[in-house]
Amino acid sequence: MEDGATPPKPPAATLAADFRSLGAPERSPDLVDGIGGDLRLAFRAALRALRRARSYYVLDGFVTEHVDLARLESTCWKLVSLKEPDYARLQQMRRRRVACLDPLRDALQADAYRDLRATLGYEVAQVLAAIVEAKAERLRRYSGQALRERQQALEALKDRTCDVFDDFLKQCAGDARTQPGDTPRSAIERLAESDVEAYMNAQFVAARLRGKRFVAIPGDVRHAEDSLRRYKQCVADTAAAKKARNLPEDFFARELDLCEQMIHLLPTKIHHVRTTGGVLEDF
């Protein structure tokens, strides 16, 4: 700059600064003026700031920040939904969470983004599973064509949810892949200890979902066989995780008990359907 020249004006506050100011409201009064104790206004202000920040952090070059912001927006919807009594509004809030996370998850295909894709995938799958469970509980309200249409839609949503869980498991296993010279170990043994619980929970929920059949097909046991295989894998991985790590004795105890019950029950049900051509009841 030449001597005597007028210095350039400082740049306007960045969107990142607006986002950070949520932790220190006095720095950004425009976000908090008039909110007072109204949580709905605070929620809307948070969403506005997050969306401005996300528009600034384009995906290229700011991947981690973009993921963090998407998860924060999802958290906003999660918190505001905790005491939502209306079914339709609650389901819409859950769909909003999926909408702000799943496109980003789908965009992160590069191997370097395995951990971020897994993080997003686990949250998306959990929300989708909650949507499936809520819809399933309301099926008894319908009959005839309306029931059949909802059953078909729910079957497709269930499959989508399981696919997202499976992708999460795949990303975790890939992120823990064996290096040259390593002693061969299973994916559960190679995972970081902080990831084990999420990995096991994903396996268990996917096993339960695969066992649900909203559109019955006489003689079809494929979903039951897949569910049985997953329950057995849960038991094997729990044993491997406990052996490889200093986990408490009651780790995954409730889920493990349910897995063992299903491993005992399912073969009889599968055999019955194969021999009679009947329909396997939901389990």
Which functions belong to the PLM regions below?
Residues 37-52, 90-102, 155-180, 223-230:
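Helix-turn-helix repeat elements of alpha-solenoid scaffolds
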Residues 2, 79-88, 125, 130-140, ...:
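Short coil/turn linking the two alpha-helices of tandem helical-hairpin repeats
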Residues 183-186, 198-283:
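Intrinsically disordered terminal tails
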Residues 1-22, 51-57, 62-70, 113, ...:
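Core solenoid repeat modules with strong leucine/isoleucine-rich periodicity
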Residues 46, 59, 64-73, 97, ...:
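Residues that mark the junctions of alpha-helical repeat units in TPR/alpha-solenoid scaffolds
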Residues 49-50, 70, 77, 101, ...:
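TPR repeat positional signature
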Residues 52-66, 103-117, 168-196, 241-244:
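Flexible helix-coil transition and linker loops at the boundaries of alpha-helical arrays
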